[in-house]
Amino acid sequence: MPFIVNTDAERAEMLREIGVENFEALIADIPEEIRLKKALDLFPAMGEPEVKSLLEKMASGNAATCDHVSFLGAGAYDHFIPSAVKTIASRSEFYTAYTPYQAEVSQGTLQAIYEYQSVMCRLYGMDVANASMYDGASALAEAALIALNVTGRNGIVVAGKLHPYTSQVLETYLEAAGDRSIVQNGLENGIGSVEALEALVSSETAAVIVQQPNFYGCLEEVEAIGEIARKNGALFIVSADPVSLGVLEAPGNYGADIAVGEGQSVGNAQSFGGPYLGILTVKQAHVRKIPGRLVGMTKDKDGNDGFILTLQTREQHIRREKATSNICSNQALCALQSVVHLSLLGKEGIRDVANRSMQKAHYLADRIAELPGYSMKFSAPFFREFVVETPVPSATIIEKMLEKKVFAGVDLSAWGEDGLLVAVTEKRTKEELDSFVSELAALG
């Protein structure tokens, strides 16, 4: 869109209106040492064709999943997104991040969020879902705060291998929440040790947290973990991948009090870290403790069904000391894309996506394990992601594979660990999997 600068006369009028003599007086409070003293180093003025050409040239330096075969995972996955998802979400009545405060003119958006909440409750086997969170990490951290508030206890126990970035977000949230503690359970064969967990959970534990599948892609012993939490009066919090729930048991069915997840894998493209989607669901007992907002169904004065924002227990709407969270917005557009995708897939569709991802991941893992020098780091069951021990550094494999237009996976050395984390989605073909194995063999 064109940008037309303000004229000198317009600037003078604005300064006069706010009672400031000149521009220098307007910025008098900004310290001299941080003021810009030189002209900005900008491109010369261009027409639209020139700007488009320049941006395309700059973007061509990116490596993206549209022109690379991707085995990247670790929280963001290359699942297929039907074109209809973007088409529907891009309709003008939906394409906004603005909160639908005016219910009378926002019934379409409110109903879409209501449907999102309903779908997530069915997928996760829970009673209530909020209108969305920033991402999976913030959803888990908010879940921990719910547990602290509900139980009045101070301790959080992480039962298995949580995503390192999620752990950092959790620590940051709890650091600001006062005298709280986080204890990490020991690992055996890539999953949390149930025996060790028994000794860690006590009457001081507010919640036991588990990620399913975990950061390594392995499946944790969630039923045993949940039983330990319940036995000690702690809340059981599960961070579950939504695609995995096409084949794995829903958290609510094995006793989760709160279930959260990262919704990127359903309807939201990988986008250099965001915007993504935080899913947060709870049992009915905790409905008044959830952060953000809910959309509820009601009746108007004529008896017609209508949708409204309800239970907005955030600090913008109620007294600060009574608020459940200071979250100030949500990811409504990302949530919309997610519910559109899941609605297009249906129950059988999400099961098919999960099943094909799982089968292809296991095929690839078996092939890689046959290569000299390569092996699976863990023997625990996994969904669509696994860790490979390699004969050469993972960084070398990733660098060499990029030359072949392949994202080989995630190098775990970034977190002080050995191994290559490989993820497989339904998009990968047998030819791509076999080619990947051949390239690994050549590098070994």
From Swiss-Prot:
One of its GO terms (biological process) is glycine decarboxylation via glycine cleavage system. GO terms for molecular function: glycine dehydrogenase (decarboxylating) activity. CDD domains: GDC-P. InterPro entries: GcvPA, GDC-P_N, GDC_P, PyrdxlP-dep_Trfase, PyrdxlP-dep_Trfase_major, PyrdxlP-dep_Trfase_small. Its EC number is 1.4.4.2. Gene3D superfamilies: Aspartate Aminotransferase, domain 1 (3.90.1150.10), Type I PLP-dependent aspartate aminotransferase-like (Major domain) (3.40.640.10). It catalyses: N(6)-[(R)-lipoyl]-L-lysyl-[glycine-cleavage complex H protein] + glycine + H(+) = N(6)-[(R)-S(8)-aminomethyldihydrolipoyl]-L-lysyl-[glycine-cleavage complex H protein] + CO2. The keyword Oxidoreductase applies. Keywords: Oxidoreductase. The glycine cleavage system is composed of four proteins: P, T, L and H. In this organism, the P 'protein' is a heterodimer of two subunits. Belongs to the GcvP family. N-terminal subunit subfamily. HAMAP family: GcvPA. The glycine cleavage system catalyzes the degradation of glycine. The P protein binds the alpha-amino group of glycine through its pyridoxal phosphate cofactor; CO(2) is released and the remaining methylamine moiety is then transferred to the lipoamide cofactor of the H protein. This is Probable glycine dehydrogenase (decarboxylating) subunit 1. It comes from Chlorobaculum tepidum (strain ATCC 49652 / DSM 12025 / NBRC 103806 / TLS) (Chlorobium tepidum).
